[in-house]
Amino acid sequence: MKVRNSLKSLRSRHRNNRLVRRKGRVYVINKVQRRFKARQG
């Protein structure tokens, strides 16, 4: 999982990317290509 300041550019890299908020953190998850996981921090 990558940790990035801004997730907007990571989200646009694949059309299945989803922006999710969990426990106060913002994540990008992808059920199809799992290598696109990222967390904002």
Curated annotation (Swiss-Prot):
Question: What InterPro entries does the record point to?
Answer: Ribosomal_bL36 (IPR000473), Ribosomal_bL36_sp (IPR035977), Ribosomal_L36_bact (IPR047621)
Q: Which Pfam families match?
A: Ribosomal_L36
Q: Which PROSITE patterns does the protein's record reference?
A: RIBOSOMAL_L36
Q: Name one GO molecular function term.
A: structural constituent of ribosome
Its family?
Belongs to the bacterial ribosomal protein bL36 family.
- Output the HAMAP family linked to this UniProt entry: Ribosomal_bL36
Q: What is this protein called?
A: Large ribosomal subunit protein bL36
User: What species was this sequence derived from?
Assistant: Rhodopseudomonas palustris (strain BisA53)
Q: What is the lineage of its organism?
A: Bacteria, Pseudomonadati, Pseudomonadota, Alphaproteobacteria, Hyphomicrobiales
